[in-house]
Amino acid sequence: MKQEKRTFTGTVNFRAAGEGMPTEVGGIAAVVNSVTDLGYFEEVIMAGAFDNALSKDYDIRCLFNHEADLILGRTKADTCRVFVNGDGNLEYTWIPDYENPTHMSVVRSIMRGDITQSSFAFTIKEQNWSESEKYGTMGKRTIKVIEDLYDVSPVTYPAYDDTEADARSIAAIRDQELEIEAAKQSQASADILKLALARYTNY
């Protein structure tokens, strides 16, 4: 499966010891059971969808803007935690290193309210399509199981370009599957008609 990215707009939190700089920073990367309109179809992530990926103990990175050279933490180093919270949503925290200029800059931007969104990169193991009032047949995609989680990121801008490209690609595959299914049904109808004509002729 192709790697995809999604962004959630919400509060990026931080915890401080006394009046000093935050000792831990984090946010919500994904909200479950909430329908998102991606412009080509609707999408919802089911509660429990992240359990499979998190059970693998994969080394998930916390990056700034999904940039590999702007690493904020990683789970194997115990400088980042990625987990499902009490609401079933995907949450993450990371421990800033204030000797690192990137960390200092990101934390200050979060404290000022300049960064309020989080994103995550993932692949899908199990999904299904259903009817959507807005997009019609197979217009709603339900993500049931996430295969892998690669990184979580506080982001300056939502990953709109990546998300739109993902949505276009997924919609194209969906449309192709619909055409194949329609062709199969058409062929099946033709076969039934031939059989009926043959029976009528023999009769």
Where are these predicted regions, by residue range?
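Terminal short linear interaction segments
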Residues: 175-203
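Signature of dsDNA virion morphogenesis modules
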Residues: 1-177
